Amino acid sequence: MKKIDVKILDPRVGKEFPLPTYATSGSAGLDLRACLDDAVELAPGDSTLVPTGLAIHIADPSLAAMMLPRSGLGHKHGIVLGNLVGLIDSDYQGQLMISVWNRGQDSFTIQPGERIAQMIFVPVVQAEFNLVEDFDATDRGEGGFGHSGRQ
């Protein structure tokens, strides 16, 4: 298992607020918590940046982290990430902040220590562009949105 450096920026993390952990042996994501002093109410349509109290340094350029919404918050309450997916590059070392957006119909209150997002680690391949005049033909060709049908 790959080890990632984590810096605790808020002394409550690891005491009042648990460190991120995998819920089960098959979990892909680590839950990130709202490292808040007071509850924050999000009205419908509002968004805010929520600190996690953590910084990470992935260091390995073949890895990146992605912040994703928690499925229950999105489905039950309309709480998703303001940027839909957050991407953490391997050389970033600042605090992990979560952009939280209430796309629901009702106000939602984020409590201190509440699990608000999840983070996964993914492999990265950096591409190098090769300029060409034409591509080799494929069955799909230039077919775009909806080209392959619904069934």
Swiss-Prot record:
EC number: 3.6.1.23
Cysteine pairs bridged by disulfides in the record: none
CDD domains referenced in this protein's UniProt entry, alphabetically: trimeric_dUTPase
Nucleotide-binding found in the keyword field: no
GO MF terms held by the record: dUTP diphosphatase activity; magnesium ion binding
Pathway as given in its UniProt record: Pyrimidine metabolism; dUMP biosynthesis; dUMP from dCTP (dUTP route): step 2/2
GO terms under biological process: dUMP biosynthetic process; dUTP catabolic process
Pfam families: dUTPase
Catalysis: reaction(s): dUTP + H2O = dUMP + diphosphate + H(+)
InterPro entries (UniProt xref): dUTPase, dUTPase-like, dUTPase-like_sf, dUTPase_trimeric
Cofactor: Mg(2+)
SUPFAM superfamilies: dUTPase-like
Enzyme class: hydrolase
Keyword terms of this UniProt record: Hydrolase, Magnesium, Metal-binding, Nucleotide metabolism
Residues binding substrate, per UniProt: 70-72, 83, 87-89, 97
Regions crossing the membrane: none
Role this protein plays: This enzyme is involved in nucleotide metabolism: it produces dUMP, the immediate precursor of thymidine nucleotides and it decreases the intracellular concentration of dUTP so that uracil cannot be incorporated into DNA.
HAMAP family in UniProt: dUTPase_bact
Entry's family note: Belongs to the dUTPase family.
PANTHER family: DEOXYURIDINE 5'-TRIPHOSPHATE NUCLEOTIDOHYDROLASE (PTHR11241:SF0)
Protein name: Deoxyuridine 5'-triphosphate nucleotidohydrolase
Species name: Shigella sonnei (strain Ss046)
